């Protein structure tokens, strides 16, 4: 009896670890941990293998996790359908790209994508940062943020997830957080994580577009591709500096 109980428990633990490893390639690792590594999971780990409470706990937990995994499966299918057939290079710009470089509608994005028209995907967090910066005490920063938000609003309308053409070639769209997603404490890390997550659905890796050294280092540590922004894209310095976010 003890062997059967222990086998049930150990089989469940292996299932959780295998599921965590598989899902983390496509979803935010913290979201996956929230789904699988529940308080009941840790309670099961603490129990002795021959404890009679193990089997009912495992059964209850498996039933609950299967329901959660069905939701993840539905999300996975939506993302797979949206990205898996994409042949273009996907670029993920951070917020400073919109603030300190050539205005996004006029930038030659193809230079960052093997001279082909790219698919530009803007994390929702980047839009939220730009929205906050509209009220920056730095007038230059506030003005640029307002211009970007106004242009994006006109282009995307209420179809943020639908790629929209931009003047110099390529398309732009917004990547909205999945339901229940808990963001990372570091906003830079969150943008890097979005790029990593997109790569899991694409035929070729998404590229993070940033001029920020810290973000480049974070991306490199996670194996995320980064593309350097050409110096000629950078706005000329003025007496009124635009601070990084």
Walk through the language-model features, giving the residues of each.
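Charged interaction/catalytic cores of defense and host-pathogen modules
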Residues: 1-61
């Amino acid at each position: 009896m003890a062997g059967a109980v222990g086998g049930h428990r150990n089989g469940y633990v292996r299932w959780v670890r295998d599921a965590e490893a598989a899902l983390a390639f496509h979803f935010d690792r913290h979201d996956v941990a929230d789904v699988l590594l529940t308080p009941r999971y840790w309670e099961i780990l603490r129990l002795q293998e021959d404890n009679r409470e193990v089997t009912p706990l495992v059964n209850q937990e498996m039933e609950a996790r299967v329901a959660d995994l069905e939701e993840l499966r539905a999300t996975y299918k939506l993302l797979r359908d949206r990205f898996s057939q994409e042949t273009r290079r996907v670029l993920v710009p951070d917020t400073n790209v919109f603030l300190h470089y050539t205005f996004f509608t006029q930038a030659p994005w193809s230079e960052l994508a093997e001279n082909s028209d790219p698919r530009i995907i803007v994390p929702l967090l980047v839009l939220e940062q730009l929205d906050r910066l509209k009220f920056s005490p730095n007038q230059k920063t506030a003005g640029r943020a307002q211009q970007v938000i106004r242009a994006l609003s006109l282009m995307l309308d209420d179809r943020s997830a639908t790629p929209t053409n931009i003047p110099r070639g390529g398309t732009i769209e917004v990547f909205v957080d999945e339901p229940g997603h808990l963001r990372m404490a570091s906003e830079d890390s969150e943008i890097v994580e979005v790029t990593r997550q997109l790569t899991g659905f694409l035929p070729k890796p998404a590229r993070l577009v940033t001029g920020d050294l810290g973000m480049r280092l974070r991306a490199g540590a996670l194996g995320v591709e980064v593309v350097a922004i050409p110096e000629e894209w950078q706005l000329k310095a003025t007496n009124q500096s635009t601070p990084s976010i």
